[in-house]
C-alpha cells in the first residue's frame, strides 16, 4: 500500500472542562467526545512523565490525532487534544511524506511527534534507531514521540 499525506489540521491545545478521578474515566470521556471507540486507539504511550493516546478517527478521514491525559495537583485526570490532526489516504503517488509535529502538554512540556510510512526515512527524521519506532499494522504507519 502506498500512502500520501492528505492534510493536517492544527488543533489548539484544548483543556477539557471535565475532570475525572480515574484515568480510565478520562479516556472514556475523550473517546465519547471524539465519537470513537477503544478500537480506534493506536497506542497509549508514556514519555517524559506524560501519558499520550494516539488514535485514529474514522469519522474524519481516519485522521491521526494525539491526546494527553493530564493529572493535576489534586490527582484529577483530563483528556486534552494536543498537536495536529493528520489524515493519510492511499495513492499511487510515490512521493511518500512523513510528518513531524511539535506538541505541548497542559503542563507546558514539549514533544515532537513523528509519523510516516517509511521506517528508514522516519528514523532519520527523528534521529532514532529503526528499532525504536512503533508500528501501526492497520494503517501501515510508523510513529514515535520524543521529548524536546
Mark where each language-model region is.
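Extracytoplasmic electrostatic interaction patches
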Residues: 63-148
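C-terminal motif of bacterial Sec signal peptides marking the signal peptidase cleavage site
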Residues: 4-7
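N-terminal export/targeting and maturation segments
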Residues: 9-71, 75-80
